[in-house]
């Protein structure tokens, strides 16, 4: 449960079906279903995307796989892995960084320390 994740109107339904959604996600992940990070739910505020990482890992996904679901795995599902999803020469990349390693502690993703888009640094606190 993440406080204030859902508006009051949606909260009762979310509390009822939330555990079922988590269980379904866990089953899909364990079965090898390809999972892309993101949502079109329309109930989450912009900038709260980091909470999805917490939900994914709480449902049994490894931290590393959760991070990959937001990068290379989504690029593969969209069939753009030749230009997106990795940091290497020739690829398009917007980069974010954290003070701590999110593979070791996924909750660190809520504190972005560095943002670079199209080669321009928009935030740098490290």
PLM regions: where:
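Small/polar (Gly/Ser/Thr/Ala-rich) solvent-exposed segments
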Residues: 104
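Short aromatic-centered micro-motifs
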Residues: 115
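Metal-coordinating catalytic core of metallo-dependent amide/deamination hydrolases
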Residues: 1-9
């Amino acid at each position: 449960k993440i406080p204030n994740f859902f508006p009051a109107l949606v909260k009762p339904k979310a509390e009822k079906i939330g555990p079922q959604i988590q269980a379904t996600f866990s089953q899909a992940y364990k079965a090898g279903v390809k999972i892309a990070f993101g949502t079109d739910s329309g109930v989450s505020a912009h900038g709260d995307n980091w909470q999805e990482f917490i939900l994914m890992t709480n449902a049994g996904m490894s931290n590393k796989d959760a991070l990959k679901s937001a990068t290379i795995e989504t690029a593969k599902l969209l069939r753009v892995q030749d230009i997106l999803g990795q940091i290497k020469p020739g690829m398009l990349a917007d980069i974010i960084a954290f003070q701590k390693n999110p593979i070791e502690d996924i909750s660190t993703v809520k504190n972005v320390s560095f943002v670079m888009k199209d080669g321009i640094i928009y935030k740098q606190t490290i």
